[in-house]
């Protein structure tokens, strides 16, 4: 590691590091990192550094301290060292990987945070930053999808809307501190919004012994809104876990690991824990992605005509940094294991159902009131099909 003035990218796991490294040309594989083209890419193997709430003085909610410093002020940081009762203790591998990250950090002009795209990813990176104690410029690579174009832009330019990202991060760190301190204070920021199907809401209502809610009704909690819908919602991670358990007999752990591999292979968006609506930008991307799915040998013929439904677009002011429902990326799978293929097919089916046009199944009427027959699609020019 003799190279100086590196841009070092830090991510959660080697499988995502491999995808990022290929996208930015860091093709030399070393022990614990990739190197090349002016970049180094390394990984933490999960939450390498833990944060324990331990304020140095009585916590004051009205502090004007910058959010990142407030996090450092109220938490202590140490390498993970779980109790042996649960089967884990500090390992030599962790020490080696931390040394690798430290050495790369010291040689870097900029360190890029490419941890998973949610608040836990930001907090894990901050914990690592304060534990290592190396000064330097940092940048956030927000990567809800791991396509090459998205990676190159995020690594070199950071979030598309830096001001909006900083606002979300400040509010999220504040909320994390409030929850850790168990303070009775109102949480900040826009809510997480989850669409809940009428059928699932009816089951919950039956168990609770209350009337079933109607489409359009909402459930509200701390920074949370559940919207009852008569349309098929996109998966979030919990819904995917339940469906995979029912249809594929997958354990929850197997579903989580398999979904993460599909994300790392650039086939789906990051599986968010709660949010399952989508922003306008994702809907626009799905215009193309749904067309690419038409070339899928299994699912192509089941995609209805018309533009994807907009019924899942954000409607309660939530920020894009809350994430969005699991969608496909438009790339075609080429190297999936059987388990990955089965889960991918489950996700594709849900995406097709969720984005079915609003008018699907209803014949269009002419001015005279007669239904028009559905026109056959004109033959299109053969497109180049991109693969993962």
Regions picked out by a protein language model, each given a short descriptive name:
Residues 1-184:
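Intrinsically disordered, low-complexity regulatory segments
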């Amino acid at each position: 590691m003799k190279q100086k003035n590196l841009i070092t990218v830090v991510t959660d796991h080697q499988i995502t590091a491999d995808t990022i490294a290929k996208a930015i040309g860091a093709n030399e594989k070393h022990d614990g990192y990739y190197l090349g083209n002016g970049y180094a890419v390394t990984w933490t193997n999960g939450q390498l550094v833990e944060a324990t709430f331990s304020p140095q003085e009585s916590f004051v909610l009205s502090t004007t301290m910058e959010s990142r410093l407030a996090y450092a002020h109220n938490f202590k940081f140490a390498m993970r060292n779980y109790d042996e009762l649960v089967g884990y203790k500090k390992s030599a591998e962790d020490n080696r990987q931390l040394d690798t990250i430290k050495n790369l950090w010291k040689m870097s002009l900029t360190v890029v945070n490419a941890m998973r795209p949610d608040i836990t990813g930001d907090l894990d990176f901050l914990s690592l930053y304060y534990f290592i104690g190396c000064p330097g410029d940092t940048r956030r690579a927000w990567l809800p999808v791991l396509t090459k174009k998205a990676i190159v832009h995020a690594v070199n330019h950071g979030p598309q809307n830096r001001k909006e990202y900083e606002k979300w991060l400040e509010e999220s760190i504040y909320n994390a501190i409030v929850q850790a301190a168990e303070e009775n204070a109102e949480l900040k920021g826009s809510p997480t919004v989850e669409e809940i199907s009428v059928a699932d809401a009816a089951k919950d209502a039956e168990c609770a012994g209350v009337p079933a809610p109607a489409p359009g009704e909402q459930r509200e909690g701390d920074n949370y809104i559940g919207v009852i819908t008569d349309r098929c919602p996109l998966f979030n991670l919990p819904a995917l876990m339940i469906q995979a358990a029912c249809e594929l007999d997958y354990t929850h752990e197997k579903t989580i690991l398999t979904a993460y591999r599909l994300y790392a292979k650039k086939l789906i968006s990051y599986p968010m824990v709660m949010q399952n609506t989508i922003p306008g930008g994702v809907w626009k991307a799905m215009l193309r992605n749904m067309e690419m799915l038409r070339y899928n040998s299994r699912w192509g013929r089941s995609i209805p005509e018309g533009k994807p439904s907009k019924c899942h677009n954000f409607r309660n002011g939530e920020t894009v940094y809350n994430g969005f429902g699991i969608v496909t990326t438009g790339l075609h799978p080429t190297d999936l294991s059987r388990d990955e293929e089965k889960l991918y097919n489950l996700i594709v089916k849900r995406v097709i159902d969720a984005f079915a046009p609003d008018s699907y199944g209803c014949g269009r009427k002419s001015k005279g009131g007669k239904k028009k027959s559905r026109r056959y699609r004109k033959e299109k020019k053969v497109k180049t099909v991109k693969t993962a």
